[in-house]
Amino acid sequence: MKHFEANFDGLVGPTHNYAGLSFGNVASLNNAAATSNPRAAAKQGLKKAKALADMGMVQGMLAPQERPDLHTLRRIGFSGTDAEILNKAAKEAPALLRACCSASSMWTANAATVSPSADTHDGKLHFTPANLVDKLHRSIEPETTGNILAATFNNSRHFAHHQHLPEHSSFGDEGAANHTRLCKDYGNAGVELFVYGQEATNPAAPKPSKFPARQTLEASQAIARLHQLDDENTVFISQNPDVIDQGVFHNDVIAVGNQNVLFYHEQAFLDTKRKLDEIKRKFGDSELHFIEVPTSRVAIQDAVKSYLFNTQIITLPSGEMAIIAPTNCQENEAVHAYLNEVVTLGSPIKQVNYFDVKQSMQNGGGPACLRLRVAMNDMELAAVNQHTLMNDALFTRLNAWVDKHYRDRLSVDDLADPQVLIESRTALDELTQIMKLGSVYQFQK
């Protein structure tokens, strides 16, 4: 039986815009009110996904959310026809309308936490959608995320789907963006690293003072219980609150791991030495590579601006590892120099490939944000909805779909236009037929 890690990238939705909704995300705030290009954003994401498929990686796509979200606008008191609701919301509560139009579900690293069957007691692949309670525009995603995941991984013999955690700050959960799995091989039981920003039930514990800590220890522990993980397969690590206050809103902005490599900034964690020792002990006797990037080489500001750590580390069919980095890393002198060096350090990382994902980057999401990692075997892959897997035919069909339905310019003011809603629903209805998802959206029910 073959074992491998698949990547399921989020397809950028038709309402991709720059509304500056994400407090604590420097890029999101800095580009607020800029005019976006949804067509270019979607094509950039598809190009990256197809390139990984062409490298021999298993690559899938996850559908975007329905936006504008009229269901939520109705829940908060707006009534009338769809056009009347959009008009009222634009006049009376423009910030709420912007939240209900976000295409942030493209960042599927926040869609869910995934534990592979090699780690779980029941031998199934487990999925728990993130509740994303810290941000209004993302807190309205989990139900539809669960629908899309269930339609993609649609076989109960192999896949276990959980409801998202209770919608309270004590269980603030941001999904795989705060979760990394280390293992010898993808088919072996691994060590799952859960990184959190605060302890909800311990006011004395360290936490940031400027920006919010979006992940709690309590949420991470709950996910580990739901996924039937052993204590010997889990490590809970506190993120350094100082770096959260410098714009490191998720752990995947400051660290990334793959198989036997953990690539992280020296300021990423609290109590680093003790936690690395715990990882080593639980990992076992196999070779393990810790690549620590010192502040003297790459400052936190440069790491955040370039998204050095929001890169993907993938294991190629050859067994070598490659870093998938945004072109922004090439444009930062210190970061580019470090990436040129990292391939010479004697670790499994032997190459760096750069991709233009600037439409996503300007909203605060790099290559790692755009993908949900799913370690699996070939039997589980055969049980996945095959219409969601990237190949030449799907790439061609989705590009044509984007050309047909997506605008090449979208401003925040356009979001109140009823035509945007019509265009988006028409596109998504067709997409569910292309990807054979069934009725996953509210407007289809």
Curated annotation (Swiss-Prot):
Catalytic site positions: E174, H250, C369 (nucleophile)
Pfam families: AstB
Pathway linked to the protein: Amino-acid degradation; L-arginine degradation via AST pathway; L-glutamate and succinate from L-arginine: step 2/5
Keywords: Arginine metabolism, Hydrolase
InterPro entries the record matches: AstB_sf (IPR037031), SuccinylArg_d-Hdrlase_AstB (IPR007079)
Annotated TM spans: none
Single Gene Ontology MF annotation: N-succinylarginine dihydrolase activity
EC numbers for this chain: 3.5.3.23
GO biological process: arginine catabolic process to glutamate; arginine catabolic process to succinate
Amino-acid positions noted as binding substrate in the UniProt annotation, renumbered to this chain: 19-28, 110, 137-138, 214, 252, 363
Reaction catalysed by this enzyme: N(2)-succinyl-L-arginine + 2 H2O + 2 H(+) = N(2)-succinyl-L-ornithine + 2 NH4(+) + CO2
Superkingdom: Bacteria
Subunit and partners: Homodimer.
Reported function: Catalyzes the hydrolysis of N(2)-succinylarginine into N(2)-succinylornithine, ammonia and CO(2).
Similarity-based family: Belongs to the succinylarginine dihydrolase family.
PANTHER family according to UniProt: N-SUCCINYLARGININE DIHYDROLASE
Name of the protein: N-succinylarginine dihydrolase
Higher taxonomy: Bacteria, Pseudomonadati, Pseudomonadota, Gammaproteobacteria, Alteromonadales
